[in-house]
Each structure stands twice: as C-alpha cells, then as structure tokens.
C-alpha cells in the first residue's frame, strides 16, 4: 500500500482529513451513533481507548462527544503529521501497527479500535497486526475492527460493482486477501473470547439521507484514485484506461443512482 500512502501525501493532508471526516459522518449515521459496537460499559468513567490509524482523531472526538462521563483517549498513526496542533485532551503518538507497541501501553487499554486501515498490513496481512493489538488490552478489554466488504458487496450499479471488483483484486494482489470477512476468525485465532461480528449497510449518494449526500460521495470516492494506482501494480482484470475512468464513473453513479457498501465490524475480548 506504499503507492496509496505516497499518492495521498501528494494530494495533501487537508483534503484527506476532510474526506475522513465526511466518511466518519456517513458511518456514524449507518451505525445510528453507536461507534463503539463492542459491549464496553462506557457509563463507567475512566476507560482507556486507543484509535490506531487515527489521522486527526476524528473518530475519537466523535466518540467522546457522545459520552456522559469522562474517558481517556489515545490516537496513534504512522503519519504523525496528521495529528491536530491542539490535542484537545487526546494523547497522540506516532506508531505503525506493524511494529511492537511501546512498553507503557502493554496491558493498558479497555478498547483498541481500527477502521479502514488494515489493508496497510500488506504484505504480511492483518493476522500479526491483530495478534499485536491484543498485547495492548487489559484483561476484559476489547479489540474492534471495521472494514469494507469488497468480496461480497451489496447489489449496486455497474460502476460501484467495478469498484468492489477492483478493490478485491487489489487486496488479493497485495497479499491481504478477503480480510474484512476473515477478521472475526483472526480475532479468534489471536486468543480473544466472546468474538462477534456485525454487518452494516452504508447508503451513499442518492441513497443516503439528503444531508449526507455530498459527504457520503466524497468519503468513498476520495481514495479511489490512490487505490487504482495500487491496482496497477498487481494482477488486475482492468485495463489502464478502465482504471482511469473508474473514479468519475463511481462519482456519477452515486450522484444519480446512489449505492451501498457493507462494513463488517468484528470485535473480541481478552480473557
């Protein structure tokens, strides 16, 4: 996924942060405001919560805004440049989830969250990353993973269908495979208990609520150009011309017909 990261950098951090905020609002609506799906008792104050791949902490701030009691929030990202200048009570630290976690955070967290980042585990794949995440948990703590299902997506128009096919071929080519559908079993293999899975349909464009029409399109279409750049480096059924045309096709289809993606949320608890 180095091509994806490099192209995202070239496009600039601010557009990517705006896209992530748009996507967060879209997911928040699909989840009916319940961003913490794992059954962690958030009514009890002082929970320690880590968002890995946090960017500017949008998910953490959104979670915090919904709570009636205080918790301790931490955000990590391989790109420390994305962290906000004002941390606003959130602890940020630069870290790649491929690397061993800092000693002070081992056995420290009640919840460790990742959303939309596990493709970055290539070429080794998510299994060692997930195993690594379990070292961060207190006894009784939870890991929650949320990723897009590109391999068995909901019915859509031809452009969104091609988008899912392109993504599935790209995930296969970089070595992560059908990880969204396999995260549940990987949590089990990592030794977690009470492992569960929730699937959520996210409406986009014309199928979204009117107030989320533009945001949902922006959130999903933003990464297509960088993703197609990765797709060019692996075995693909698409020609270069078809990959060039895909971003505009998806945007037009979402604006005129709408579309859907399925997000798979897998979560498990440390004994």
Swiss-Prot record:
It comes from the Eukaryota. This is Methyltransferase psoC. Disruption phenotype: Abolishes the production of pseurotin. Its EC number is 2.1.1.-. Belongs to the methyltransferase superfamily. LaeA methyltransferase family. The keyword Transferase applies. The gene is psoC. GO terms for molecular function: methyltransferase activity. It comes from Aspergillus fumigatus (strain ATCC MYA-4609 / CBS 101355 / FGSC A1100 / Af293). Induction: Expression is induced under hypoxic conditions. The keyword S-adenosyl-L-methionine applies. GO terms for biological process: methylation.
